[in-house]
Design a protein with these regions (language model features):
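A short beta-turn/loop motif at secondary-structure boundaries
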Residues: 38, 150-153
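Short, well-structured alpha-helical interface segments that form or flank functional binding sites
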Residues: 16, 41, 65, 69
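A short glycine-rich, His/Asp/Glu-containing loop-to-beta-strand
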Residues: 39-48
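Extracellular/luminal regions of secreted and cell-surface proteins that mediate adhesion/ECM remodeling
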Residues: 140, 165-185
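A short hydrophobic beta-strand segment most commonly corresponding to one strand
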Residues: 69-72, 152-169
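Catalytic core of non-heme Fe(II) oxygenases with the double-stranded beta-helix
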Residues: 47-136, 141, 146, 172-174
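Short edge beta-strand segments in beta-sheet-rich domains
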Residues: 41, 99-101, 154-158
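Non-heme Fe(II)/2-oxoglutarate
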Residues: 1-36, 52-56, 98-100
């Protein structure tokens, strides 16, 4: 596998794409907490993965306490593209079925087999890579990529970025209460 830096300064295409992603990040923050923000691009890169490769569960850092990260799927091998989509019709991961080979894994908690019996909500999700799909999430969100097994030259290619976020006003408990009271903003 390889990770290659994608320039976001001094490169016309990189600067343009950085601007688009920063606008999306500002919208993401505004829709999440209802506060306007300013953004700067921290880093952009591509990841080139081949049969047997995976990316262990990790999170991302930014220079600011609040950050946004994203993944865009650029190329997906046939061995992944032909798998079912767990968000549409999913029979689970019983008996190491390979049902999520090459998928992105998001986790924001811990889960166990008895969780449903204890009314504990699911705290993980698998996302099937589809060319052109962009997912954006808080930089603290732990994520990884499941290994896939295809032909030797099959490539799973993604673009990723980390975006620094500075709020234009201080976040208070009032923001939380408003967002969870059912009031419309």
């Amino acid at each position: 596998s390889a990770q290659l830096t994608f320039p976001h300064e001094g490169d016309e295409v990189g600067e343009m794409f950085s601007g688009v992603l920063q606008r999306l990040a500002r919208e993401f923050v505004d829709r999440s907490i209802g506060i306007e923000c300013e953004t700067t691009m921290e880093s952009m890169w591509t990841v080139h993965s081949y049969s047997g490769d995976y990316n262990p569960v990790h999170d991302h850092g930014t220079r600011t306490p609040m950050g946004v990260s994203c993944i865009m799927y650029l190329q997906v091998p046939r061995c992944i593209a032909t798998l079912g989509n767990p968000s549409e019709n999913f029979d689970g991961l019983n008996e190491s079925s390979g049902a999520v080979d090459g998928f992105t894994y998001l986790t924001w908690g811990t889960n166990g087999m008895r969780d449903i019996n204890m009314l504990r909500p699911i705290t993980e999700e698998y996302i099937k890579p589809e060319v052109g799909t962009l997912i954006m999430f808080p930089s603290w969100l732990r994520h990884g990529v499941m290994p896939f097994f295809g032909k030797e030259d099959d490539e799973r290619r993604t673009f990723s970025a980390n975006i620094n976020v500075n709020l234009k006003e201080k976040l208070t408990g009032d923001h939380y209460r408003k967002d969870h009271s059912g009031e419309q903003s």
